[in-house]
């Protein structure tokens, strides 16, 4: 009888334990497009002390090491790079884990969620033509193309962090009259080589701040290398780069430019929020899949300025993503800018990757024209709300039929001059 009673009590205790246990966690983004096998982003709960985080990661590292000794074949890497955004408390780590260690992580009370790492890529295609700077400074978009801007502002005093494949900082486009470069290296999550082996990042930087091809010709650009020479990387690497930017950029005088993307990611979108809350305006490419931008990151992040691409006729590029999350359409077809194969090399390519740096440069321009800098909300409002109707319109297939795209021309005057800066917006 006593035995039966004890069994009953144990059963009740077991039920009580299960009742008070936390929800069973699952890996988000598992099986998503571009998922990287056995690689994960672990997001910890906010408010954990440094000692609690260290205790957790040490325990997971020890567990992983013990399990790995019993496994055959290649072992996963274990706990890798850690991240912590002081602006919001968003923190965690990335790593490669076997199934047993992954389950231990999922069961840990310190963990908020676990996301499978995914591939991110550039958004560029090669074509011919040049016209983008003319389009952001004129309503009349007929040739010959010219660019009008406030030379006393022109991005002076601002820094744009190009989260991409790197920058050829010795390129002529970034050299000053005294022989120094406005381009510098900041962070590299890819390799130990501070160079742009692809060219994409150098092209974007040239559109932002090049002395010939740039929107903000006096801005500084910083290379944040998160993509390889092949133009791809991981969500984990991108988040690490964003973490570095959030902790090192000067609030209200900085812009982050991200001409990249991949599958929708809660972690990546959270990192966008962290950058925004750190006082850094963040501009991202919408993507080149001709789909709703709500399906990809960082384009789907609410606090990002998401940029689609138009061609020289002000038509939305056939490759551009679309949808209600697009804030701005900017020049993205046949854009000429600097390239990484030599200090004088240029190249013409297309994509929302090319549209994004036009707006990042414009954000830097607006910041430099504002006394004391400007916070991200102010710059976002400046770019997205100062609108009037552009001639012509067409229906958007992704909106209800009664809604129409009004071609909008953002036309705003710098407080320092009468030079007009224009850009097409959704």
Swiss-Prot record:
Keyword Transcription: no
One cellular component (GO) term of this entry: extracellular region
EC number, UniProt record: 3.4.21.-
Positions of the pro-segment in this chain: 22-123
Residues of the Inhibitor I9 domain: 39-122
Catalytic temperature dependence: Optimum temperature is 45 degrees Celsius.
InterPro entries tied to this protein: PCSK9_ProteinaseK-like, Peptidase_S8/S53_dom, Peptidase_S8/S53_dom_sf, Peptidase_S8_Asp-AS, Peptidase_S8_His-AS, Peptidase_S8_Ser-AS, Peptidase_S8_subtilisin-like, Peptidase_S8_subtilisin-rel
Functional pH dependence: Optimum pH is 6-8.
Lineage top rank: taxon: Eukaryota
Phenotypic consequence of residue 400 to S: In strain: XA
Keywords, ordered alphabetically: Collagen degradation, Glycoprotein, Hydrolase, Protease, Secreted, Serine protease, Signal, Zymogen
Effect of residue 319 to F: In strain: XA
Any Pfam family hit: Peptidase_S8
Predominant cellular place of this UniProt entry's protein: secreted
Signal peptide per UniProt: 1-21
Gene Ontology process terms (BP): collagen catabolic process; proteolysis
Role according to the record: Hydrolyzes gelatin, casein, the chromogenic substrate azocoll and the cuticle of the nematode P.redivivus. Immobilizes P.redivivus.
Full protein name: Cuticle-degrading serine protease
Protein's organism: Orbilia oligospora (Nematode-trapping fungus)
